[in-house]
């Protein structure tokens, strides 16, 4: 009798353990896509000031490459989309606080980001370049010449860290417009803006009266860009990546990119002499 009682306790213990494990698994279940589907809406963090990835057009509509790709993703998932605007740090915080579903703002998909976020498949390939004054190249002919120069940008970006590694003095901005960045370089408040080549190309072409240019043949870090997701939101991450794969295969990414960049940025660029810089 005693032996049977012990066996019964062991069996009950096994049942209780199984129930506990099931409850824990249920508590840890990823409902990120289910929540979006039930709410019928994606909430996306962006800046609204980064031409041509996220900006307001003449009709005061939020548009841009990243914005339009995100809109197409929502359309194919059959949900609405709402954008919340922050600077880069604010976008990161909104993900960490789960106030937004993903961030769309030309984010570099680098190893540092991978430690803290889930990264989408790339929607854009590019490399880094420098905007300088038209009259004198801001005294810069190579990355080594950044030492002592004033580099403009938002804090905590890989571009600013690269400039700092070469000895530049960092001048930080809070979600400033492209025009302000370029004007400050032109009038000598800063010496350079280190950022994405295609963004800089479109910005300088959009503001031809500001006497700045992209420094010739000083390019570094072939990069790929995309969306950032909370580390725990694997279900939503997977769902969006499925749609991005469809958009690449059917040519939609190419079509949207050519509208904003006059180039197919969904494929790796054919550019030589791109230096590799390890950004700490």
Q: What does each model-identified segment do?
A:
Residues 83-93, 138, 156, 172-187:
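Short helix-initiation/N-cap motifs at beta->coil->alpha
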Residues 27-106:
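Extracytoplasmic small-molecule ligand-binding "clamshell" domains
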Residues 20-22, 67-76, 226-265:
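Extended ligand-binding regions for polar small-molecule ligands
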């Amino acid at each position: 009798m005693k032996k049977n009682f012990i066996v019964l306790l062991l069996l009950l213990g096994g049942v209780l353990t199984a129930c506990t494990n099931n409850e824990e698994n249920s508590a840890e279940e990823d409902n990120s896509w289910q929540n979006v589907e039930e709410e019928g809406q994606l909430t996306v963090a962006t800046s609204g000031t980064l031409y041509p990835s996220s900006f307001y057009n003449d009709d005061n509509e939020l548009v841009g490459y990243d914005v339009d790709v995100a809109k197409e993703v929502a359309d194919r998932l059959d949900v609405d989309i709402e954008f919340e605007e922050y600077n880069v740090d604010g976008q990161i915080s909104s993900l960490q606080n789960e106030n937004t579903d993903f961030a769309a703002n030309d984010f570099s998909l680098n190893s540092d980001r991978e430690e803290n976020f889930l990264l989408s498949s790339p929607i854009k390939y590019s490399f880094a370049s420098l905007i300088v004054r038209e009259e004198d190249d801001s005294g810069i002919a190579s990355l080594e010449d950044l030492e002592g120069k004033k580099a403009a940008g938002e804090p905590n970006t890989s571009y600013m860290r690269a400039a700092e590694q070469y000895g530049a003095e960092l001048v930080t901005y809070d979600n400033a417009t492209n025009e302000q960045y370029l004007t400050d370089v032109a009038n000598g408040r800063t010496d350079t803006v280190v950022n994405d080549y295609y963004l800089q190309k479109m910005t300088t072409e959009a503001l031809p009266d500001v006497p700045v240019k992209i420094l010739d043949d000083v390019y570094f870090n072939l990069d790929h860009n995309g969306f950032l997701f909370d580390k725990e939101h694997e279900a939503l991450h997977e769902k969006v990546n499925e749609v991005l794969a469809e958009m690449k295969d059917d040519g939609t990414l190419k079509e949207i990119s050519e509208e904003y960049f006059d180039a197919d940025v969904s494929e790796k660029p054919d550019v030589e002499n791109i230096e590799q810089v390890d950004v700490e």
